[in-house]
C-alpha cells in the first residue's frame, strides 16, 4: 500500500491501514466511522469479548508532539460520549467490557509506517 499522499484522503487512508493492521493483531471490525451528534469513532472492534473504541491518528512528523499527543481531554470526552451513544444504539454489546485505544501512525525515515498502539489509552469516569 503506497504511503499516504493526498491531504483529502489522508484520514480515510490512515483508517484503512489501521483497520488492516489491527485485524492482523487479532481484532475484528464491528464498525468503521461511527458518527453521531456527540462525535465520531474511527474504528470499533472486538478484542475477544472486549469492545474497543479506537481513535486513529496520522502525523507526518512529531514536531507538534506526534499523533498520540493530539488526543487531548476534549477529544477524549467526545469519544466517550460517542461510545455511550453507540452502546445505546446497540444493546447487543451492553454486556461487553469496553476500552479506549489510540493508534498513532507516522512515517519513518524510509517512509514506511510506524504504528504505536496504546491500549486503554484513557478511561471513562
Swiss-Prot record:
Record-linked Pfam families: UPF0102
UniProt similarity note: Belongs to the UPF0102 family.
Gene Ontology terms, MF aspect: nucleic acid binding
Gene3D superfamilies reported in the protein's UniProt record: 3.40.1350.10
Signal peptide: none
Cystine pairings recorded for this chain: none
InterPro entries noted in UniProt: Restrct_endonuc-II-like (IPR011335), tRNA_endonuc-like_dom_sf (IPR011856), UPF0102_YraN-like (IPR003509)
Name recorded for this polypeptide: UPF0102 protein ABO_0585
UniProt xrefs under HAMAP family: UPF0102
Amino acid at each position: 500500500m503506497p504511503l499516504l499522499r493526498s491531504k483529502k484522503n489522508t484520514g480515510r487512508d490512515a483508517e484503512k491501514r489501521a483497520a488492516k493492521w489491527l485485524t492482523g493483531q487479532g481484532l475484528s471490525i464491528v464498525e468503521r466511522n461511527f458518527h453521531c451528534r456527540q462525535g465520531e469513532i474511527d474504528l470499533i472492534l472486538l478484542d475477544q469479548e472486549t469492545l474497543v473504541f479506537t481513535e486513529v491518528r496520522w502525523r507526518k512528523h512529531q514536531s507538534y508532539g506526534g499523533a498520540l499527543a493530539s488526543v487531548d481531554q476534549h477529544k477524549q470526552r467526545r469519544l466517550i460520549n460517542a461510545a455511550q451513544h453507540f452502546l445505546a444504539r446497540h444493546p447487543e454489546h451492553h454486556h461487553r467490557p469496553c476500552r479506549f485505544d489510540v493508534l498513532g501512525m507516522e512515517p519513518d525515515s524510509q517512509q514506511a509506517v510506524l504504528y504505536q498502539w496504546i491500549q486503554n489509552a484513557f478511561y471513562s469516569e
